[in-house]
Amino acid sequence: MNKYMSVNVIFAKFSRDYMATKKYLPIRPSEMGVLNILTRCEGDFTPMKLAETLGVSKPMVTAHINVLLKKGYVREEPSPDDKRSFYVRPTEKAIALADEAEAKQTEYIKAVEERLGEKDFAALTELMEKAQVVLGEMIDR
């Protein structure tokens, strides 16, 4: 196997295993991404601002919001400035789930850091970020 195929296999295994750490979630990881923004970032978020923050389309965010509304994780609050617009607000249920998810993900990531050591973990983080930037620039968003 050549080095590029080896890296491809490693990336695939890492992606699979990382996604497996989120199997306990009662919602999809992409929907959890919306909740993370709403519960961990300051400010008011409209669907458009959520889409921009996440780097995805507004229709995709709208679909996520609709699911989260039905499941009781978010509520809509009319904008006082623009009657056509609304803010998406997390519910207490969303905050509780975000807290639980953060604790579990931190546990997994700390385990990786403990196994690698502080220096290798920092290097891994830096290299993964660089690789993500390159891939992000190459794919059609």
Question: Over which residues does each language-model region extend?
Answer:
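N-terminal leader segment of winged-helix/HTH proteins
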Residues: M1-L25
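N-terminal positioning helix adjacent to the helix-turn-helix/winged-helix DNA-binding module
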Residues: K3, S30-E31, T46, K93, ...
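Pre-recognition alpha-helix immediately N-terminal to the DNA-recognition helix
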Residues: S6, G33-I37, A96
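Charged, amphipathic alpha-helical coiled-coil/dimerization segments
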Residues: V67-E126
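N-terminal helix-turn-helix DNA-binding core of bacterial DNA-binding proteins
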Residues: R16-M60
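C-terminal regulatory/oligomerization modules of transcriptional regulators
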Residues: M1, K119-R141
